[in-house]
Curated annotation (Swiss-Prot):
Its main location: plastid. Substrate binds at residues 126, 155-156, 187, 193, 259-262, 332. The lineage of its organism: Eukaryota, Rhodophyta, Florideophyceae, Rhodymeniophycidae, Ceramiales. Binds 2 manganese ions per subunit. Pathway: Carbohydrate degradation; glycolysis; pyruvate from D-glyceraldehyde 3-phosphate: step 3/5. GO terms for cellular component: chloroplast; cytosol. Mn(2+) 1 binds at residues 399, 403, 458. This is 2,3-bisphosphoglycerate-independent phosphoglycerate mutase. It catalyses: (2R)-2-phosphoglycerate = (2R)-3-phosphoglycerate. It comes from Antithamnion sp. (Red alga).
Length: 510
């Protein structure tokens, strides 16, 4: 393929930028965005479904960054882990899973405890409470001491909903004398993914030591109430010990999150050789398993092994002899690389990656710009070098600031991204570069509930798709009623590369 004859494509993913005509709680509607408004009015555009069955999730289940980027890269609808695991519970295959029974048998033989760790909510983004309930059923069968280490959500759910989910678990374990809730911890601590090891360490110590944040009360609901009285929401609950059952030699440990990126640091604190995050305890003969593969470099058995995926967009670009660049800040780096490539860690031949560090702050509403300006400068530099035929860039701002629930900061973040788009447009103005602007899911478009309470979770609204090709501005029409699965076939169509049979998405170009 003659690379010089190709019009380079820039795929710009505005993370968390949904489309809604409802102005209430809509930071995108409230923001001053003259650039993207002009593009929407003057270039071919359509709306894409980014939630539910359109991205391999249950009906009306909100999309998320992992699923969104996987679907964009796949060019097909893939049944996501949430669906696969829930289906296995429904058809009872879950209760015959070899790896789970292996874990429980090990603890029976060693007369030790089984520890279950994961996000306790019905958010469905990283985990699901029904999967935890199914594990507790297996615990009843084996009658081994089972310790629950519950991570509270408040991000993919309402900010103060943890008591509802914990109560559901209490109702189950009241019938099961050998199961106890041993720790709680907000996901801010247990699910950091930006190497803020001081947060992970606090969660780790609650699980392995008696010295961490003990409570005189063993009533977990009262403990949560006390935190609420201090205006501490679920996401930020300090790691707290409820029962004195530590993780010790010969114990077993099950991680039930199915999405790996935010639980990986906590896993590493137990399992990674030559771990350097903080000083950890020596725990011998610890048997580990994870619901899905969290880290391919660790030989940890999984309950639901990865299914082989081939002919993702990045692989096809590479096989066609084209060069590509993936560009994101820390918070979304895994999404434009690992997830976009179908769970493959290593870059494809001809694929370069650039990571811009996210700011080290408590919450991202403190600097709504995050690293958007640095990202934009790197993108402009890459465009000017004329090395790449395909560039993927992710702007994290709408999603990450949207998750804070801070409306004013989110509006500012949206306006900053709009300014960055303007700089990119000036750069490609007199070139043959093609810019595609889209998103992976909604968030900043829905920040207030019907009860006027802050909403920090994603929305199920569609996302925009704008095709900016100055050489064919008036000649291109786009299909309506598309989905994220149609983006990769559209890009291959523009590049005049055959769309593989594995891609069941369709080109959006009519």
């Amino acid at each position: 393929m003659n690379n010089k004859s190709i019009s380079p494509i820039i795929l710009m993913i505005l993370d968390g930028w949904g489309h809604s005509t409802n102005a209430k709680g809509n930071a995108i509607h409230e923001a001053n965005t003259p650039i993207i408004d002009k593009l929407w009015d003057n270039y071919p555009k359509t709306l894409l479904s980014a939630s539910g069955e359109h991205v391999g999730l249950p009906h009306k289940q909100m999309g998320n960054s992992e699923v969104g980027h996987t679907t964009i890269g796949a060019g097909r609808i893939i049944n996501q882990d949430l669906v696969k695991i829930s289906k296995s519970i429904k058809n009872k295959e879950f209760f015959n899973n070899y790896q789970l029974h292996n874990i429980y048998k090990y603890s029976c033989e060693k007369n030790s405890k089984v520890h279950i760790v994961g996000l306790c909510s019905n958010g469905g983004v990283h985990s699901h409470i029904n999967h935890l309930k199914a594990l507790i059923q297996i615990s009843k069968q084996y009658k081994v001491m089972t310790c629950l280490h519950l991570i509270t959500d408040g991000r993919d759910t309402l900010p103060k909903q943890a008591k509802l989910f914990v109560k559901e678990i209490i109702d189950i374990i009241d019938e099961n004398y050998n199961t106890e809730i041993c720790t709680i911890s907000g996901r801010y601590y247990s699910m950091d993914r930006d190497c803020r090891w001081s947060r992970t360490e606090k969660a780790y110590k609650a699980m392995v030591e008696n010295s961490c944040n003990q409570n005189s009360s063993s009533d977990i609901l009262s403990i949560i109430d006390k935190y609420y009285e201090q205006n501490i929401s679920d996401e930020f609950l300090p790691p707290t010990k409820i029962s004195m059952h530590n993780i010790v030699h010969n114990d077993s440990l099950i991680f039930f999150n199915f999405r790996p990126d935010r639980i990986r640091q906590l896993l590493h604190s137990f399992a990674k050789p030559n771990f350097k995050g903080f000083q950890r305890k020596t725990i011998k003969n610890l048997m580990l398993t994870t619901f899905t593969e969290y880290d391919s470099t660790l030989s940890i058995p999984t309950v639901f092994p990865n299914e082989p995926k081939k002919n993702f967009l990045g692989q096809i670009i590479s096989n066609s002899g084209l060069k590509q660049l993936r560009l994101a800040e820390t918070e979304k780096y895994a999404h434009v690389t690992y997830f976009f490539n179908g769970g493959i860690e290593e870059p494809f031949p001809g694929e370069n990656r650039e990571l811009i560090a996210s700011p080290k702050v408590e919450t991202y509403d403190l600097p709504p710009e995050m690293s958007a300006y640095q990202l934009t400068n790197s993108l402009i530099e890459a465009i000017n070098k004329q090395l790449y035929q395909f560039i993927v860039i992710n702007y994290a701002n709408p999603d990450m600031i949207g998750h804070t629930g801070n409306m004013n900061a989110t509006i500012e973040a949206i306006e900053i991204v709009d300014q960055c788009i303007e700089k990119v447009l000036h750069t490609i103005e007199d070139t043959n570069n093609i810019l595609i602007i889209t998103s992976d899911h909604g968030n900043a478009d829905y920040m207030l509930t019907d009860e006027n309470k802050p909403c920090t979770s994603h929305s199920i609204n569609p996302v925009p798709f704008i095709l900016i090709n100055n050489r064919q501005k008036k000649q291109t029409n786009l299909h309506s009623h598309g989905s994220l699965a149609d983006i990769a076939p559209t890009i291959l169509d523009i590049l005049n590369i055959n769309i593989p049979n594995e891609m069941n998405g369709k080109s959006l170009i009519t």
